[in-house]
UniProtKB/Swiss-Prot annotation:
Residues 264-274 have a biased composition (Basic residues). InterPro entries: NPL, PPIase_dom_sf, PPIase_FKBP_dom, PPIase_Fpr3/Fpr4-like. PROSITE patterns: FKBP_PPIASE (PS50059). Broadly expressed in leaves, flowers, stems and roots. Detected in root apical meristem region and pollen. PPIases accelerate the folding of proteins. It catalyzes the cis-trans isomerization of proline imidic peptide bonds in oligopeptides. Histone chaperone possibly involved in H3/H4 deposition to the nucleosome. Associates with 18S rDNA chromatin and negatively regulates the level of its expression. Belongs to the FKBP-type PPIase family. Keywords: Chaperone, Isomerase, Nucleus, Rotamase. GO terms for cellular component: nucleolus; nucleus. GO terms for biological process: nucleosome assembly. This is Peptidyl-prolyl cis-trans isomerase FKBP53. GO terms for molecular function: histone binding; peptidyl-prolyl cis-trans isomerase activity. The lineage of its organism: Eukaryota, Viridiplantae, Streptophyta, Embryophyta, Tracheophyta.
Length: 477
């Protein structure tokens, strides 16, 4: 898209052939030229052998510019512009290139697929089919190898590391022998054993119960977490999409003897069961005597949020951390009564409460001059977009921010049409409507500098008034 302009002088017809241009011409405005005459000037347009048609009439010091909506493409006949009067008239608009749109579309299509689907015309059908099959195979391999990354991106930020280790996953070259050994041992039943051991990191104590995992951390449905024990083993707790909560153990690269590690895990588990209920919080170290704390650094943020919930287990933990000697016995009784499902509901509830606040802040944009654009609802992602130079149709309700009085509205009427970005409406609308898609709804808070300024409008809008508009985009042309 590029700028286009033309000056038509009195008595000098200006010919224009759309076929000589590289794209479609959009004429958006006519402006009166400089001069001393105070008489009106009229610009006319004639296509081919047809009679001239008057486009607009401009009067000095009163009406010196006029918005237009004219389009000329390579299918049109030659056009001739003429001016009657003593002053010239300037036509302006923009050129919409043909080839660039096609190139952009093909480029976007290639990027979205992640595969080169183009083939040269010289390739025969057999070569094309084989190449396409290879690309599909590569694409499937790509999806399989990046399953972990996709699931991490889709899961909400809950302070828990998400990782899935599948038996079918290809091992790295350096650890190929060790991974093969791990699979053979896992087939003997070792992957059925479950153990979670928390390690150093945050200063948050962890509750335990008979029905919980060994560190007392409930595992939300659809999540998986990774922890590490003192012997160097990595434990991965994976919950599949069907909620089976299957747990599988992955050994570290340097661990060669998996059977010996499993025996150590059993021994450590038995010792933990004997010591259950006897753990006392260490205030100086900020952790339980067994050293059990969550590894994730931002777990402190989750703990601080869950403290605000009345009756939750984390609230009991906060109180016990202040008086460890008096509340250690009470804490042991409470954690036996608590079920993993209750604690999972508490943690997931905390995450759900955080999400609306974050999303709300991301839907409000505040500009330095005071303009506020708030997204109320979204239309279709592939809907037409409102960009400068395009004609948009909107429904709106205009109010005074001071008292909420409605001064203008077209609800129940035909949508209001205007060309975006050419100054035909107040600046707050040109900026606030830009970027909307069909079906989007926004609330615009417009300062006087981008509204009607110190003059006001029509007696209904006082000077220096802040305005609010509820705007819905109906159509884009």
């Amino acid at each position: 898209m590029g700028f286009w302009g033309l000056e038509v002088k009195p008595g000098k017809p200006q010919a224009y052939n759309p076929k000589n241009e590289q794209g479609k011409i959009h004429v958006t405005q006519a402006t009166l030229g400089t001069g001393l005459s105070k008489e009106k000037s009229v610009i006319q347009c004639s296509i081919g052998d047809k009679a001239p048609i008057a486009l607009c009439s401009l009067l000095p010091n009163k009406i010196e510019c006029c918005p237009l909506n004219l389009e000329f493409d390579d299918d049109d006949e030659p056009v001739e512009f003429t001016v009657t009067g003593d002053r010239s008239i300037h036509l302006s608009g923009f050129l919409e290139y043909y080839q660039d749109d096609e190139d952009d579309y093909e480029h976007d299509e290639d990027d979205s697929d992640g595969i080169d689907v183009g083939e040269s015309e010289e390739d025969d059908s057999c070569e094309y089919d084989s190449e396409e099959d290879e690309q599909l195979d590569e694409f499937e391999d790509f999806l399989d190898s990046n399953l972990e990354r996709y699931r991490n991106a889709a899961a909400p930020k809950s302070g828990v590391i998400i990782e899935e280790i599948e038996d079918e996953e290809k091992p790295a070259k350096d650890n190929k022998a060790k991974q093969t050994k791990k699979k053979s041992q896992a087939s003997e039943g070792e992957n059925a054993k479950k153990q979670i051991v928390a390690i150093e990191g945050a200063h948050v104590p962890v509750l335990e119960s008979e029905d919980e995992d060994e560190d007392g951390l409930p595992i939300p449905k659809g999540k998986s977490s990774e922890v590490e024990n003192a012997s160097g083993e990595k434990m991965v707790v994976d919950n599949d999409e069907q909620g089976s909560n299957k747990k599988r153990k992955a050994k570290a690269a340097e661990q060669d003897d998996g059977q010996e590690s499993a025996n150590k895990s059993k021994k450590k588990k038995n010792q933990k069961e004997k010591k259950k209920g006897e753990n006392v919080l260490n205030e100086e170290a900020g952790q339980v005597q067994t050293g059990n704390v969550l590894k994730k650094q931002d777990i402190s943020q989750i703990s601080s949020n869950t403290k605000a919930q009345d009756g939750t287990a984390n609230n009991a933990m906060s109180e016990s951390s202040k008086t460890p000697d008096k509340s250690a016995e009470k804490k042991t009784k409470n954690k036996k009564k608590k079920k993993p499902s209750d604690e999972a509901a508490e943690i997931s509830g905390t995450v759900e409460k955080q999400t609306p606040a974050d999303s709300k802040s991301s839907q409000v944009r505040t500009y330095p001059n005071g303009l506020i654009v708030e997204e109320l609802s979204m239309g279709k992602p592939n809907g037409k977009r409102a960009d400068p130079g395009k004609t948009v149709s909107v429904r709106y309700i205009g109010k005074l921010q001071k008292n909420g009085k409605i001064f203008d509205s077209n609800i129940g009427k035909s949508p209001f049409k205007f060309r975006l970005g050419i100054g035909s409406v107040i600046k707050g609308w040109d900026v606030g409507v830009n970027g909307m898609r069909v079906g989007d709804k926004r609330k615009l808070t417009i300062p006087p500098s981008m509204g009607y300024g110190v003059k006001g409008a029509g007696g209904q809008i006082p000077p220096n008034s802040w305005l609010t508009f509820d705007v819905e985009l109906i159509n884009v042309q």
